[in-house]
Amino acid sequence: MKAYANIKLASQPACETIERDPARNRLREGGAMADDDALFQKGMPIRREVLGPEYVDASMARADEFMISFQRATTAWAWGWAWGDATLDRKTRSLMNLAMLTALNRAPEIKLHVKGALNNGVTVEEIKAALLHATAYCGIPAGLDAFRAAHEVLVTEGALSKP
């Protein structure tokens, strides 16, 4: 695994429920302090395991001075803070992501997270069930886009045969 210890993290809070202590570059999590750098270091291996090291390393390598802040924040907050919490297992988190991304109609991210879901042991039937459930609440157009995106990845990854 690549070492990213020397990267400084952005100073924006991830959401309203997280308070920042600007003097210490830390996030407050339920009364406890979590250092951004520690969250980044915790998040990087999780991100690489779920999305694949090739994808993550390429994202980090092509991030210029402007985009590196986004990459750092994503790794610390989404992967270190949210995915790093042990309350939910990775399969559950993957299914939640697919449902939320369907609601947001974010096909490129659905593709990425379908591959991540497969890496986390989610079955094709579970992916289909999550997308159908999201379709019932988000509407047919969003569901159709999600199914198309997922289908493309499932065929590419060999989880489905080509029609």
What are these regions (language model features)?
Residues 18-32:
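Short, Lys/Arg-enriched N-terminal segments with co-localized hydrophobic residues
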Residues 74-78, 95-102, 130-135, 146:
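Short alpha-helical scaffolding segments that buttress acidic/His motifs in well-ordered protein cores
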Residues 29-91, 119, 145-163:
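Acidic, glycine/proline-rich low-complexity segments that act as flexible tails and inter-domain linkers
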Residues 103-128:
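Mid-chain, well-packed structural core segment of small domains
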Residues 138-140:
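C-terminal structural segments of small proteins and small subunits
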